Amino acid sequence: MPPRELSEAEPPPLRAPTPPPRRRSAPPELGIKCVLVGDGAVGKSSLIVSYTCNGYPARYRPTALDTFSVQVLVDGAPVRIELWDTAGQEDFDRLRSLCYPDTDVFLACFSVVQPSSFQNITEKWLPEIRTHNPQAPVLLVGTQADLRDDVNVLIQLDQGGREGPVPQPQAQGLAEKIRACCYLECSALTQKNLKEVFDSAILSAIEHKARLEKKLNAKGVRTLSRCRWKKFFCFV
């Protein structure tokens, strides 16, 4: 049949609407909880502020408990990292321990120019962490690295009869002893190695979560296999 011409009064045939192109769904955002622990005044808050806000606090302000949230991309996938800034004073021991159980990674911080804060890593902070969270990875972080060679700081340490700055090999040795993922020194003021610290924390947390998920899946498979085995014998 030859094509038919439409009259002016006859409406054109309706066409099915073209569906819009499908958009690829964004990958789900992975959440990571990172808790910073360490003595008061070692620079935990400064690390977080410098990393998240690209700034440096003008003066020291003791922290009870603060949280910061940052989104980063890891291999193109979005990751939301929550940074928990805890107080190092004994008055906040009970409050601080409440945030430990569901933590994905810890940053155990000490100041390289405060030897007592380094000593407290093994005497206070690691035991406290492991009491409430025995599995999460720990990174040992030496803060205030810009003061290691500061003349005024060295004079104050000498006049006060205190030890000098914590040697890097000693800190590295402690990291190996406590089975920390690594030891890193950084400066919130100059931001030297600052990004490396949090990058390492994020990657350590992701690897830890992947291991837990793999272990959980393997446990589920074993449980399912045992159930089927029991049912098999019941039918026999």
Curated annotation (Swiss-Prot):
Pfam families from the UniProt entry: Ras
S-palmitoyl cysteine: lipidated positions: C234
Membrane topology of the entry: Lipid-anchor
MF GO annotations: GTP binding; GTPase activity; metal ion binding; protein kinase binding
PROSITE patterns per record: RHO (PS51420)
Signal peptide: none
Highest taxon of the lineage: Eukaryota
Annotated GO biological process: actin filament organization; endocytosis; establishment of cell polarity; signal transduction; small GTPase-mediated signal transduction
Sites bearing Phosphoserine, chain numbering: S25
Entries under SMART domains matching the protein: RAB, RAS, RHO
Tissues expressing this chain: Highly expressed in pancreas, placenta, and fetal brain.
Example of a GO cellular component annotation carried by this entry: endosome membrane
Quaternary structure note: Interacts with PAK2.
UniProt protein name: Rho-related GTP-binding protein RhoV
